[in-house]
Amino acid sequence: MPELPEVETTRKGIQPKVEGQAIQKIIIRNGKLRWPVDPSLVEKLPGLVVLSIKRRAKYLLLETDQGHLIIHLGMSGNLRVLPQHEPAVKHDHIDLLLENGFLLRYHDPRRFGSWLWTEAPIQEHSLLKSLGPEPLTDAFNAEYLFQKLQGRKTAIKTFIMNNQIVVGVGNIYANESLFLSGIHPTRPAQSLTLTEATKLTAHIKTVLSAAIEQGGTTLKDFLTPDGKPGYFEQKLNVYGRENLPCPQCDSAIEKVVLNQRAAYFCSNCQKQLDSTVKIK
């Protein structure tokens, strides 16, 4: 699934040729995504100018003077900017044709992404209004995280993947951040000290920033808008490396399942305070 770095890479990739352009038309080949695409967009969008392209969590927000397109890439989606004469292939579900001769093409084999339209204030949309702070902003800091940890028995990995706590820390980057912080993923969130919260906050920021610089992580379907894979996979320390040697101590990387998601860790470098503590 594309996570924050992949979505930010997409935003940066499409921005130069999409922002500031008038929409000529939208072609909806298959609107059966996670939520049905509003067929009235065929009438609503032509003539509108894309004023800005922003990201909130894993949502791309295309602003016009009449409303916003809210795009989510789902499990397997990607966006590419192509010449308008480029023929569509299987799973190319939506094209946004622009006045500069290019189009924004949405490709999604599993069709779990979404294209939504809203004319209400964007910050009040039901998908956005309850989200936590962006991890790369000053609002996400050690003091904030430590305060949120108090009284929470949830496993720390599950906790930092909660979008109401902080947005965009998906499975790959949660595993990597915890490894660099020396924190076992199953530890109760409330067990972290302020020092550990400080380390974890810093590593979440550095891991996400590094992933954005590398164009994200391509594990299966994700491609950047120019059709290239992300290269952060080459820098992964623990994610997807079960039974391979830890890059710090050569112990075997282990794997457990937390909240239906895989957690990868080195039990030597990431100590569990008490293996009898119940987690959820």
UniProtKB/Swiss-Prot annotation:
Swiss-Prot/TrEMBL cofactor(s): Zn(2+)
One annotated GO biological process: base-excision repair
One of the record's GO molecular function terms: class I DNA-(apurinic or apyrimidinic site) endonuclease activity
Active-site residues, record numbering mapped to chain: P2, E3, K58, R261
UniProt KW keywords: DNA damage, DNA repair, DNA-binding, Glycosidase, Hydrolase, Lyase, Metal-binding, Multifunctional enzyme, Zinc, Zinc-finger
Gene3D superfamilies attached to this UniProt entry: 1.10.8.50, MutM-like, N-terminal
Top-level taxonomic group: Bacteria
One protein family per Pfam: zf-FPG_IleRS
Entries under SUPFAM superfamilies matching the protein: Glucocorticoid receptor-like (DNA-binding domain), N-terminal domain of MutM-like DNA repair proteins, S13-like H2TH domain
Role summary: Involved in base excision repair of DNA damaged by oxidation or by mutagenic agents. Acts as a DNA glycosylase that recognizes and removes damaged bases. Has a preference for oxidized purines, such as 7,8-dihydro-8-oxoguanine (8-oxoG). Has AP (apurinic/apyrimidinic) lyase activity and introduces nicks in the DNA strand. Cleaves the DNA backbone by beta-delta elimination to generate a single-strand break at the site of the removed base with both 3'- and 5'-phosphates.
Subunit structure: Monomer.
Family to which this protein belongs: Belongs to the FPG family.
HAMAP family, sorted: Fapy_DNA_glycosyl
Entry protein name: Formamidopyrimidine-DNA glycosylase
